């Protein structure tokens, strides 16, 4: 799965909001409508999802110098491999390879290197 990347510097809309029918609530999404997730234990510079984890959980990335915009306040953090990842409340944001349609939240509650949670703004 290709990882969406902002190409221009400055501000860029990288997130939206949609209803996840399986969760019966609104979730934060990428610009393609795919649900965004956080991983328990990842916050303030601590990364657990690295290496092969990133195949199932692609990070939401932007180009260096880009200010991410969305329906909520977003930030950025530099990943261990040097890429810039979008954050919500200090937690890095990811999509899930098991979601292929808008509004799906198939990664909610999954446990591997921690527990994954759909972001509910």
Describe the residue ranges of each PLM region.
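Compact beta-sheet-dominated domain cores in extracellular/mature segments
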Residues: 3-121
């Amino acid at each position: 799965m290709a990882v969406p990347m902002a190409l221009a510097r400055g501000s860029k809309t990288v997130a939206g909001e949609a209803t996840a029918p399986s969760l019966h609530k609104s979730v934060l999404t990428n610009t393609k409508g795919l649900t965004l997730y956080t991983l328990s234990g990842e916050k303030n510079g601590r990364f657990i999802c690295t290496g092969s984890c990133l195949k199932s959980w692609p990070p939401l990335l932007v180009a260096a110098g880009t200010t991410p915009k969305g329906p909520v306040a977003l930030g950025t953090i530099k990943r261990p491999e040097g890429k810039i990842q979008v954050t919500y409340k200090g937690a890095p944001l990811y999509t899930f390879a098991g979601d292929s349609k808008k509004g799906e939240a198939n990664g909610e509650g999954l446990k591997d290197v921690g527990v994954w949670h759909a972001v509910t703004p």
